[in-house]
Amino acid sequence: MSAFRTLDDAGSLKGKRVLMRVDLNVPMESGRVTDATRIERVAPTIREVAEQGAKVILLAHFGRPKGKREPKDSLEPVVPALGAALGRDVAFAADCVGDAAAQAVAALKDGDVLLLENTRYHAGEEKNDAAFADALAANGDVYVNEAFSAAHRAHASTEGLAHRLPAYAGREMQAELDALTKGLESPQRPVIALVGGAKVSSKIDLLENLVAKVDMLVIGGGMANTFLHAQGKAVGKSLCEKDLAETATRILAAAEKAGCRIILPVDAVAASEFKARAPHETVPVDAVPDASMILDAGPRSVAEINAAIDGAKTLVWNGPLGAFELAPFDAATVATAKHAAARTKDGQLVSVAGGGDTVAALNHAGVGQDFTYVSTAGGAFLEWLEGKALPGVEALRAKG
């Protein structure tokens, strides 16, 4: 049994008004959706519920209008892309509460889909205001949360509603929760975590939580430089948070105490300037020239990481190993991603990855579809990895 209430627990939805929180915060240009990935991910759940004969009422935010009606943050331009993904007409209401919403909901027939205007047009959304949550709940009989990416926020449409109506996880939310549970809550061991990206400062909580939970932790990207510096190695002109040397030392000590093996780069690809195809050399990490900066992990480091992955049953990945957006400094990220993908396809590894740069890096390597699960959630994925309770998820926990 799942630890969370899902659509499988909801019974018949025929004739019910189903308020479904979705993530439609998609990139737009000149009033058109330029990347419909988020829409395509929630479309199957919307279709499933509509085909059961429910009246599907979609709630979403867009941008950061901060409680004011900003025309540039209207959800109306999303309607054509939503209709195209669903293969059906989608109605639109000019507000998410009040008469405009109530009238649009009253006009729905079984199987219809309605998108309500941006919840963040109301200050009560981000304050999780009780009266605003009541006003949203007035238009529904059942609540479905299909927006894991917003689950770390205790807002009226992500958390408040779940206490006012029978509440269930949608299919995409369910898949995300199942994947994260497999990744960290009850994983097959040994577990290896790969954490990259530029700064230690943004991932202190993450690193401290992971050393207590995983068997091996690979630290890569710019943040590895701070750890190398803490170990007394000169990193030249590399990005390095020297003021966090003490924090890095503390994390290394915590890992040793917890029996977590830390894997840092042993060699690096260094260049004197940060640009595509800049002249570069591969050097040991204790021989980085003063005028150079580390822009990627070297081949010996990649071999060590891949050997560690071979000895693991579960991989959790957040952040690239180098400046992957500039060739040839994408080599370590691409080689490691391809190796992890091959192990996953062979049934040897459960691989869970997430965070904006990570998704882009895996897609750049051409293996995004080969991982067990790739989360598009960003902040919510990070907070889960940090061991924090997510309000939108906690509200869906099965009682008993």
Swiss-Prot record:
Entries under InterPro entries matching the protein: Phosphoglycerate_kinase (IPR001576), Phosphoglycerate_kinase_CS (IPR015911), Phosphoglycerate_kinase_N (IPR015824), Phosphoglycerate_kinase_sf (IPR036043)
Record's subcellular location: Cytoplasm
Single GO molecular function: phosphoglycerate kinase activity
Gene assigned in the entry: pgk
Record-given protein name: Phosphoglycerate kinase
Gene3D superfamilies: Phosphoglycerate kinase, N-terminal domain
GO CC annotations, alphabetized: cytosol
Reactions mediated catalytically: (2R)-3-phosphoglycerate + ATP = (2R)-3-phospho-glyceroyl phosphate + ADP
E.C. no: 2.7.2.3
Residues binding ATP, per UniProt: K203, E325, G355, G356, D357, T358
Record GO biological process: gluconeogenesis; glycolytic process
Family membership: Belongs to the phosphoglycerate kinase family.
Organism: Methylobacterium radiotolerans (strain ATCC 27329 / DSM 1819 / JCM 2831 / NBRC 15690 / NCIMB 10815 / 0-1)
Main location: cytoplasm
Biochemical pathway: Carbohydrate degradation; glycolysis; pyruvate from D-glyceraldehyde 3-phosphate: step 2/5
UniProt entry keywords in alphabetical sequence: ATP-binding, Cytoplasm, Glycolysis, Kinase, Nucleotide-binding, Transferase
PROSITE patterns: PGLYCERATE_KINASE (PS00111)
Subunit organization: Monomer.
Binding site for substrate: D23, L24, N25, R38, H61, F62, G63, R64, R120, R153
Enzyme class per UniProt: transferase
